[in-house]
Design a protein with these regions (language model features):
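Low-complexity, Ser/Thr/Pro/Gly-enriched N-terminal "stalk/linker" regions
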Residues: 1-6
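Aromatic-lined, polymer-binding surfaces characteristic
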Residues: 9-231
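A short, structured loop/turn motif at beta-sheet edges
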Residues: 33-35, 417-424, 488-491, 680-684, ...
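A residue-level signal for conserved active-site and pocket-lining positions in enzyme catalytic cores
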Residues: 75, 714, 820
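Extended polysaccharide-engagement surfaces of secreted carbohydrate-active enzymes
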Residues: 167, 171-656, 798-898
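Gly-Asp-aromatic-enriched flexible segments
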Residues: 535-539, 652-797, 801
Length: 898
């Protein structure tokens, strides 16, 4: 470990990670006794605590105040571990104490807001650790038990079901771990914080500020049945949701995680710490899910603790009624656990800033130790406009949307939960308005307008003249009820969806959306009706970022002699097939690095095939579908400057003087392009110039971008109207990477600029980013009249076959009904066919000859959803029936309770 000296031009001292490395260095000193490790740690602490260090700014790390809390916690640990080292001076200790007290005073004021958040808890932890290392018990008690302190956070932040109110796996683990670490620190001063039970706040919001125009909700939904909150509740709440490998599905701002995953490099907040404090067998079980290289060397037992449990948590379905996380698990008898199916659903409290607008969505699907989808598959970091303008929006999830808009956060209604033998089922209702997402996401950094934000990130998109205010939603619909009933059988998942407007005259487009990876086949019954560069060219919509869209339609083709069921004859489902590969650095990326196009981890190596069926549920004579390319993250964003320059014929005698014919600049990424059309009268030489700067991945990160810049199909138009491809001429490249040649991107794929393919594109990425890249073309003898081209960035880069695809069925009207079936398998599919079998019924024919009829009843019963009636305690009429036949004989039947 080495760290740079403070750069006084920055508004922070160090990268936050250096404080954690200082703590680790101090641990090594304790283990080895070698003074050099103490000296190294002390050197860092001296710079941090000097008068011109933290107290000058005050900002210790390069991130947010929450991370300064982590910084101070690690710095306090480091100081404590080398406290008795004989190299300290009196001035050193004075500076450290003054710095810690300065921070504590700062945080004392910060936590009096009355809110609960992971930020405040981390900031409190830094203050408690600072007070502890100074031996100041009074300050420890203030931050543990005082107003806004850790006990207050426990009362306000923990939901009745034990989840942290932000309902995100990482923040659940973070808060459970921080509370537990505070307990360890408090125990050294005779305080028993680990067993504290506090009275809940019982409030229905976790924010005292006014409602935000961007749609963020801090409201808490669901029941309050407990009269206490405890640290153990945080640890206990997640255990039922972990699978047999110790991996949990993501929800809101989280992907799949193991119990030891949260900020693993910095601090170990996992079930080994929980077991040290509470010795519960459930925690010992969680430790058994960890590999040897995943053990906690700070808090773990030398030998894995033994445990006895009557039932293993991963064997049954479960849900959390406040957080709204659901996991349904198949349990076919005598089937290996890795072959069972898990499906995750989301329906509960929004989760504040980390909440996604995806109530009634399928937010996870796992089989064979592999994940098909999670809420963060497409992820841009917090400090980008895409975070709120796309990542959290409804169309980025597996759900039904209205007009491709964003669902408003509103309290859901649970319709049913059933855990049986033949099936598992869950039903939920959402009743809310839909709108455009907050325009431009939300303001981050110092940029005051979306134009400024676009430029600093290097990500352009069209900005209309009369757009909404920055970060404000617009274009609201009336309330629309959406209902989803998910049924999990031994072999597949069924999603029944019903949506209906609250206004009888309102007409909407309803989309039943899935995002799956590696599309290999589209049903032969479909034919392409058209292709559009974007799913929508509406500049207010997040659908503009989904590109390369094929629109399909199918006509009913029925046998004349076939018998109609509810007016629908022989309606066979439309099928889409997918193939996904998993390897060490393929669909396992983010455990190594977050900067990857598909944020998923802990997947077993191998392949997973998935069949997706859409069952016709209406009498319409056609079904409409779309297949498009969602905006998977890639390091393609850059600030692009371009010029078309010329040397004129008239300047031959006086020397070659360049004239700028056209120029521009924009952010080139998934979108962003400019069309060039310039006159060439009197031009002797043409110069195409490009200069780039890497765009920011938010305010905190800047990485070298991929090579993407091309001149799209440049053409010389002659005076007699002939169009000559520039790629056919000899041109000279200076400081320009020619890549794979004309018409190929820098990884050998096709060149697409804003979803338009250019088969004669000329590479233009500068080799040295500090200089302009120049392409020179001699026009003498060409009788040139005009130059035409497109300039922009290629996306996606390289092979596209494994990319995630957005697939949806669309219906138009006042209401919509969908039925979709998903079977993940390893190449030996059980489903032979799926078809319509009557109102809200489907028939699934299996490879062994069995036929299963899956039906949902009461899904269209809107009386119990009538807002004019008191239906809070009304029992839902929704129920599910599965019937199984062999050779026409009923062999099994199961129905959920009415």
């Amino acid at each position: 470990w080495s760290y740079p000296s403070i750069d006084f031009n920055n508004d922070y001292l160090f990268d936050t990670s250096h404080a954690h490395h200082a703590r680790d260095c101090a641990i090594i000193y304790q283990i080895s006794g070698e003074p050099r490790f103490a000296q190294k740690t002390a050197s860092f602490l001296r710079e941090w605590s000097a008068p011109d260090g933290y107290r000058r700014l005050p900002r210790a790390g390069n991130q947010e105040l929450v991370h300064d809390g982590e910084f101070f916690k690690s710095a306090a640990c480091a100081y404590d571990l080398i406290y008795d080292w004989d190299g300290w001076t009196e001035k050193d200790r004075e500076n450290i104490e003054q710095t810690m007290r300065f921070y504590m005073e700062y945080i004392d004021a910060e936590i009096c807001s009355g809110e609960a958040s992971n930020w405040l808890l981390a900031e409190i932890a830094g203050a408690v650790y600072s007070a502890a290392v100074l031996g100041d018990k009074e300050r420890m008690e203030r931050f543990l038990y005082g107003p806004g302190g850790a006990a207050d956070e426990l009362a306000k932040g923990v939901l009745d079901d034990g989840w942290w109110y932000e309902a995100s796996i990482g923040y659940n683990l973070m808060c459970a771990g921080l509370m537990s670490e505070l307990s360890v620190a408090a125990s050294h001063f005779g305080m028993n914080f680990k067993d504290i039970k506090v009275t809940p706040a019982y409030r229905r919001t976790n924010c005292v500020a006014e409602a935000r125009l961007d749609g963020l909700s801090n409201d808490i939904w669901g029941e309050n049945e407990k009269n206490y909150r405890s640290i153990e509740m945080l640890w206990d709440s997640l255990i039922p949701f972990y699978d047999y490998r110790g991996v949990v599905m993501g929800i809101n701002d989280s992907a799949e995680q193991k119990s030891n995953a949260q900020t693993k490099a910095f601090y170990k907040l996992d079930y080994e710490l929980a077991y040290r404090l509470y010795k519960k067998p459930e925690y010992a079980y969680m430790i058994s899910r960890l590999g040897d290289d995943e053990r906690n060397v700070l808090f773990g037992e030398e030998v894995r603790p033994a445990y006895e449990l009557d039932e293993l948590p991963y064997e049954k379905s479960c849900y959390a009624q406040n957080a709204g996380s659901v996991v349904l698990r198949s349990h076919k008898k005598d089937r290996p656990i890795r072959e069972q199916i898990q499906v995750g659903l989301k329906y509960g409290s929004h989760g504040g800033a980390h909440g996604h607008y995806d109530r009634a969505s399928m937010n996870g699907l796992m089989r064979y130790g592999r994940s098909l989808t999670n809420p963060e598959n497409i992820w841009y970091c917090y400090h980008t406009f895409m975070y709120k303008f796309y990542c959290q929006t409804s169309i980025n999830h597996n759900m039904v949307t209205i007009d491709l808009k964003q669902q408003e956060a509103a309290p859901p209604k649970q319709l049913l939960f059933y855990a049986g033998d033949a099936m598992q089922a869950f039903g939920v209702e959402n009743n809310s308005r839909w709108s455009y997402p907050p325009y431009g996401g939300w303001p981050v950094g110092k940029q005051k307008t979306i134009e400024e934000r676009q430029w600093i990130e290097g990500r352009s998109f069209p900005i209309p003249e009369n757009h909404p205010e920055y970060a404000v939603r617009s274009g609201f619909t009336e309330p629309v009820i959406t209902r989803r009933v998910t049924v999990l059988t031994d072999d597949y998942v069924v999603n029944f969806d019903y949506a209906k407007s609250s206004q009888p005259e309102a007409i909407h487009d309803f989309q039943c959306i899935y995002h799956l990876q590696g599309l290999t086949k589209v049903d032969d019954a479909l034919s392409i009706e058209c292709h559009t560069a974007q799913l929508s060219d509406d500049p207010l919509s997040s659908a503009q970022f989904i590109t390369d869209c094929d629109w399909y339609e199918t006509k009913n083709e029925v046998n004349k002699d076939s018998q109609a069921v509810n007016g629908i004859k022989d309606r066979v489902a439309v099928k889409f097939q997918f193939h996904t590969e998993y390897a060490e650095k393929k669909n396992n990326f983010w455990r190594y690095d977050w900067k990857w196009q598909n944020r998923t981890a802990y997947n077993e190596y191998g392949t997973l095939d998935t069949d997706l069926y859409f069952v016709p549920m209406k009498q319409d004579d056609s079904m409409q579908f779309a297949v498009a390319c969602p905006p998977e993250f890639a390091l393609v964003n850059k600030r692009l400057y371009w010029k078309v320059c010329a040397v004129m014929e008239k300047d031959k005698a006086s020397g070659e003087q360049e004239v700028v014919l056209a120029e521009g600049k924009f952010g080139a990424w998934i979108l962003g392009k400019e069309t060039v059309d310039v006159a060439l009268d009197g031009v002797k030489k043409l110069y195409l110039k490009v200069f780039t700067e890497d765009g920011r991945q938010g305010d905190l990160y800047e990485y070298e971008s991929l090579k993407t810049i091309f001149w799209g199909n440049p053409v010389i138009e002659t005076k007699n109207k002939k169009k000559l491809d520039m790629s056919e001429f000899v041109y000279v490249c200076e400081n320009t990477d020619e890549g794979c040649g004309v018409g190929k991107d820098y990884e050998g794929g096709r060149v697409t600029i804003q979803a338009e393919e250019f088969d004669k594109a000329i590479p233009a990425e500068p080799k040295d980013k500090k200089k302009w890249g120049v392409i020179t073309l001699d026009l003498e003898g060409l009788n040139a009249a005009r130059f035409h081209a497109v300039i922009g960035g290629d996306y996606p880069v390289g092979d596209e076959s494994g990319k995630r695809r957005t697939v949806f069925q669309q219906q138009t009207g006042n209401s919509a009904c969908f039925a979709s079936v998903i079977e993940p398998h390893e190449g030996d599919a059980m489903i032979q066919s799926v078809q319509y079998a009557g109102s809200w019924s489907i028939k699934v024919t299996l490879a062994d000859g069995r036929e299963q009829i899956v039906s949902v009843k009461g899904i269209e019963n809107m009386e119990e959803s009538d807002p004019t009636k008191n239906n809070a305690q009304t029992k839902s009429s929704v129920r599910v029936l599965i019937e199984e036949f062999q050779n026409g004989t009923l062999i099994r039947s199961e129905e959920t309770a009415r």
